[in-house]
Amino acid sequence: MTTDEGAKNNEESPTATVAEQGEDITSKKDRGVLKIVKRVGNGEETPMIGDKVYVHYKGKLSNGKKFDSSHDRNEPFVFSLGKGQVIKAWDIGVATMKKGEICHLLCKPEYAYGSAGSLPKIPSNATLFFEIELLDFKGEDLFEDGGIIRRTKRKGEGYSNPNEGATVEIHLEGRCGGRMFDCRDVAFTVGEGEDHDIPIGIDKALEKMQREEQCILYLGPRYGFGEAGKPKFGIEPNAELIYEVTLKSFEKAKESWEMDTKEKLEQAAIVKEKGTVYFKGGKYMQAVIQYGKIVSWLEMEYGLSEKESKASESFLLAAFLNLAMCYLKLREYTKAVECCDKALGLDSANEKGLYRRGEAQLLMNEFESAKGDFEKVLEVNPQNKAARLQISMCQKKAKEHNERDRRIYANMFKKFAEQDAKEEANKAMGKKTSEGVTNEKGTDSQAMEEEKPEGHV
């Protein structure tokens, strides 16, 4: 209901107006949250569960006394919708708003602060009035890198999520550029969606979903079909994708603590092979998932027999080295260095570990550290021609970097010198002008003093 519909007069308080004319927006229809639209918003889209929303608001008690206002702080209030970060009335009310809309909400205590209140400003069992302006809203950034944005259409059940290796059954609809390219029910193992033409972003998002949850996922190229695209679906390289996904059911995979050493070693051999298949196919993020399982299972495994310990160390060394190579391909050089460090912790003279750490550090412009690693490679294997070439590359890059720095600093100092000279010149000019004015004043004063006697009897 808009403010003009049935408004009595300008003198009636906003609280009374909402109480009499407001729309009941509660699911129970118990008049616990009443709403009047003061300014209609733009479009038809409203915020969804988990969206980050930006609002300005004023809050008053039923007697008209203001207890809070974002305007007084000169900054919007930001929260995630439907996550219990605000009072119930806000989660209900803001979910009905459109961008740019201003509304009035009247909230009964059970939808606000209840019998506890929020002392000292809000007493027990207080009915509250709010004026809210919805400035903006956007989906939940699942990994804080902009690669997967989730908008939840329907909240899931319970608190359990699928884990890596879980068996899931989902319904999905994929769109690109407004065209639907995929629509089906499918069952698969989380982390292995690629085997079913499902992008890695779906695997990642499923680990944050609950049973029966329905959401829209916006996938950047990194989490979609990447540089290769997907000719089967007519998807071009580096395309952005939109998927609507419903998690119908899932069965979690065994956690590490539920497996004995024998089972872990058996599974390590299986996932190592899967990881290698993904790596050879250019599916580096999928390969990371498989190699990462080996680390999660075996890195903290204790009390092994000599035979088990040897097998475990072999799997871990291979996993860290392969993870380092994956991270190099993914341009995550810091992670590549960390994995090499762990591999070298198991085998300090490992040629691949030293070489790959050198590669990562060279790409991070850590020329001296990289050169040191390549020199160690030659100590292990003097015949490694690639390492010798990389040492030359380190020296060349370091020289170029130093020369570039010298040019930058030289230009910087030149500008500073020119600026100082200009300021000195301006000071000198100002001083000269000042002296000229003083001399002129002095001359005029003398002339006046000389003329003064002549003007009097």
Curated annotation (Swiss-Prot):
Summary of subunit composition and partner proteins: Part of a heteromultimeric cytoplasmic complex with HSP90AA1, HSPA1A/HSPA1B and steroid receptors. Upon ligand binding dissociates from the complex and FKBP4 takes its place. Interacts with functionally mature heterooligomeric progesterone receptor complexes along with HSP90 and TEBP. Interacts with NR3C1. Interacts with Akt/AKT1 and PHLPP1; enhancing dephosphorylation and subsequent activation of Akt/AKT1. Interacts with IFI44L; this interaction modulates the kinase activity of IKBKB and IKBKE. Interacts with IKBKB and IKBKE.
GO BP annotations, alphabetical order: chaperone-mediated protein folding; protein folding; response to alcohol; response to bacterium; response to cocaine
Cross-referenced InterPro entries: FKBP4/5/8-like (IPR050754), PPIase_dom_sf (IPR046357), PPIase_FKBP_dom (IPR001179), TPR-like_helical_dom_sf (IPR011990), TPR_rpt (IPR019734)
Regulation: Inhibited by both FK506 and rapamycin.
TPR repeats by residue range: 268-301, 317-350, 351-384
Organism: Homo sapiens
Domain PPIase FKBP-type span(s) in chain numbering: 42-130, 157-243
Catalytic activity of the protein: [protein]-peptidylproline (omega=180) = [protein]-peptidylproline (omega=0)
Start and end residues of each stretch annotated as Disordered: 1-24, 420-457
Record's note on what induces expression: By androgen.
GO molecular function annotation: FK506 binding; heat shock protein binding; peptidyl-prolyl cis-trans isomerase activity; protein-macromolecule adaptor activity
UniProt modified residues of type N6-acetyllysine: 28, 155
Top class in the EC scheme: isomerase
Residue positions, PTM N-acetylmethionine: 1
Gene Ontology CC annotation, any one: membrane
Outcome (variant: residue 155 to Q): Mimics acetylation; impaired interaction with AKT1 and PHLPP1
Keywords: Acetylation, Chaperone, Cytoplasm, Isomerase, Nucleus, Phosphoprotein, Repeat, Rotamase, TPR repeat, Ubl conjugation
Protein name: Peptidyl-prolyl cis-trans isomerase FKBP5
Compartments it resides in: Cytoplasm; Nucleus
Free-text description of this protein's post-translational modifications in UniProt: Acetylation impairs ability to promote interaction between Akt/AKT1 and PHLPP1. Deacetylation by SIRT7 promotes interaction between Akt/AKT1 and PHLPP1, leading to suppress Akt/AKT1 activation. Ubiquitinated, leading to degradation in a proteasome-dependent manner. Deubiquitinated by USP49, leading to stabilization.
